[in-house]
């Protein structure tokens, strides 16, 4: 009943700054994303943001706790571990951050102690594995395995919407263990965390997270880090602002802890804290505490990196335009090539397209020099799982390079500190430049570094972003990586908008890969068809099972629906047609329909704003012709 529905979580709301993003040209898309990303630092709606004194106090206390655990490893030879965990994007950020922090420890002669977990294991770094995300006991089991033999474990569970059952199971386990510190990171008030029943479990996310919140008031082994940074620019797409905020918060806490341990500044200009506050001291105003200055300075570095990226909005828009000119083609592809952390970020961005926009596995790809070797992932080389997991440059050369056409866009990702990059990358790039593919260059440049060696007139578009900050501890490209994430998110999101996979700021062809996305699909159908919740769900089931009479499927567990739907494309658009009054639809021919959202019809890449026509009460329609009055599946 609509009157009894709870308020929607902030992370599931529509961002008012981007509600017309589907009508924008490439530069307009980037400018709207700039406004949304500003909320990461400015906060949203009167809630505490990342710069709020209450959040800063929690971050500082967590940093002190972390530094103490790291110090015990150094001085007392203890086996303390720090474990980051999450589903989808959160798990991928957990992987990248643990890899980065371990390399910093190794550089200074310390034993790595950072670990990560991702629901579904390492295969989920490339392809979402739906059912483990909704399995709390599996989450607890995975945590027990990684904690085995440790003296103390700091567990950091990341769930942007406070909605992941996998993480809830881990928090439920960790907060009842005497040798564990429990940290929950997300971007909703705890009171709005997900409260839906979970299959084969007797608790909800909200029950677990409220218990942790209560515990955090009295214990130094429980933390909740939940600044409110506003709705995503594409509704519910936590890979964007949620993922970026996660990277900022993890960096702020754990780089500061490493600075304390190592006695080395994160940046040459950053001083060490003058003192540590007493255990009983509570700091609510960072301007009064010299101890907080390195952490505040670090947040300022991230903020300045964000500002620098969007001062290059024109360049980012030019790369977006280049990518969209290929993605909007029938067989177009966008391919990222890079090395080290920057290459891995291309891998991550490409991996997020299937669940978010329902694209094919080959439409967005990422390749990194050296492949899985040296990527710091737990399971090592994943190439044996299939073509999609073959991510080295050698595998690009054998699998993809021979098939490149003028409908493909290859984007080369460089850091200026890499000089010419790995020799193989230079060789591969030259071969790509000689191919029919459209080739772009994106350079994250370190101040004072010449980039002339990277430039080549054969690139159709080349963009250089010179950053005020680049490395952390003189080695890891933390700030360059944050900048690159913002740019890649803009490029891939913009390309999908121009392809017609977004209406307003809603992703209308999401892949139903977990419980949360199943719920989101029902909400989208309700919103755009005018149907009530019950009818919207029934239309969704009809679309999943391809039967007009879906009554037999109504009482199956949601996991059954997800298993059936996770490999299907265009389920939500089909359900929209059904919920909107289309009583007769040819299910067998639905795969032939080309995704075109009416308001972005014609793929306005060159800056021509389309003229939206009145669309009636149901909006996103999959057309087989260009005539607005033709609905055909």
PLM features: what roles do these ranges have?
Residues 1-633:
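Conserved N-terminal alpha-helical segment that immediately precedes and caps sugar-phosphate-binding
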């Amino acid at each position: 009943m609509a009157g009894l529905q709870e308020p929607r979580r902030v992370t599931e709301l529509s961002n008012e700054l981007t509600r017309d993003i589907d009508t924008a040209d490439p530069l307009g898309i980037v400018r709207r994303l700039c406004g949304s990303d500003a909320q990461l630092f400015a906060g949203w709606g009167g809630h505490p943001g990342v710069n709020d004194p209450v959040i800063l106090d929690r971050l500082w206390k967590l940093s002190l706790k972390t530094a103490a655990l790291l110090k015990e490893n150094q001085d007392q030879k203890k086996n303390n571990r720090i474990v980051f965990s999450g589903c989808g994007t959160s798990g991928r950020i957990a992987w990248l951050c643990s890899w980065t922090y371990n390399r910093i420890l190794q550089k200074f002669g310390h034993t790595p102690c950072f670990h990560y977990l991702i629901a579904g294991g390492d295969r989920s770094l490339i392809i979402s594995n739906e059912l483990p995300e909704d399995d709390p006991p599996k989450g607890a089991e995975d945590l027990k395995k990684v904690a085995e033999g440790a003296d103390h474990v700091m567990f950091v569970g990341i769930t942007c919407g406070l909605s992941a059952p996998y993480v809830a199971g881990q928090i439920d386990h960790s907060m009842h263990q005497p040798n564990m510190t429990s940290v929950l990171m997300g971007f909703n008030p705890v009171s709005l965390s997900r409260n839906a029943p979970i299959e084969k479990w007797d608790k909800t996310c909200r029950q677990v997270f409220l218990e942790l919140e209560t515990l955090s008031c009295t214990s130094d082994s429980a933390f909740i880090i939940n600044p409110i940074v506003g709705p995503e620019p594409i509704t519910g797409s936590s890979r964007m602002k949620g993922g970026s905020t996660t990277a900022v918060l993890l960096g702020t806490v754990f780089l500061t802890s490493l600075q304390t341990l190592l006695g080395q500044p994160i940046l040459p200009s950053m001083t060490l804290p003058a003192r540590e506050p007493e255990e009983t001291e509570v700091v609510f105003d960072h301007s009064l505490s010299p101890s907080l200055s390195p952490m505040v300075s670090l947040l300022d570095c991230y903020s300045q990196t964000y500002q620098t990226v969007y001062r290059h909005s024109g360049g980012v828009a030019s790369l977006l335009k280049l990518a969209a000119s290929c993605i909007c083609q029938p067989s177009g592809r966008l391919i990222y090539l890079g090395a080290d952390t920057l290459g891995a970020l291309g891998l991550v961005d490409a991996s997020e397209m299937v669940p978010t926009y329902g694209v094919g596995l080959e439409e967005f790809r990422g390749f990194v020099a050296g492949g899985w070797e040296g990527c710091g992932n737990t399971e090592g080389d994943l190439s044996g799982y299939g073509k999609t997991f073959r991510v080295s440059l050698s595998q690009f050369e054998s699998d993809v390079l021979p098939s490149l056409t003028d409908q493909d866009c290859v984007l080369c990702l460089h850091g200026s500190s890499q000089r010419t990059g790995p020799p193989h990358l230079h060789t591969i790039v030259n071969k790509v430049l000689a191919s029919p593919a459209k080739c772009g260059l994106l350079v994250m440049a370190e101040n004072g570094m010449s980039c002339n060696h990277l430039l080549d007139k054969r690139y159709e578009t080349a963009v250089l972003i010179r950053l005020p900050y680049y490395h952390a501890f003189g080695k890891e490209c933390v700030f360059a990586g944050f900048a690159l994430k913002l740019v890649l998110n803009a490029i891939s999101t913009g390309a999908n908008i121009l392809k017609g996979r977004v209406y307003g700021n809603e992703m209308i062809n999401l892949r139903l890969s977990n419980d949360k996305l199943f719920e989101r699909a029902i909400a989208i159908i309700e919103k755009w068809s005018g149907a009530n919740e019950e009818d919207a769900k029934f239309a969704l089931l009809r679309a999943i099972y391809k039967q007009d009479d879906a009554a037999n499927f109504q009482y199956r567990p949601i996991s059954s629906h997800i298993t059936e739907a996770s490999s299907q494309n265009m389920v939500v658009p089909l359900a929209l047609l059904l919920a909107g009054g289309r009583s007769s639809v040819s299910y067998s021919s639905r795969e032939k329909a080309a995704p075109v959202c009416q308001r972005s019809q014609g793929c306005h890449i060159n800056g021509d704003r389309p003229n939206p026509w009145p669309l009636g009460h149901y909006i996103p329609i999959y057309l087989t012709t260009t005539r607005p009055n033709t609905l055909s599946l």
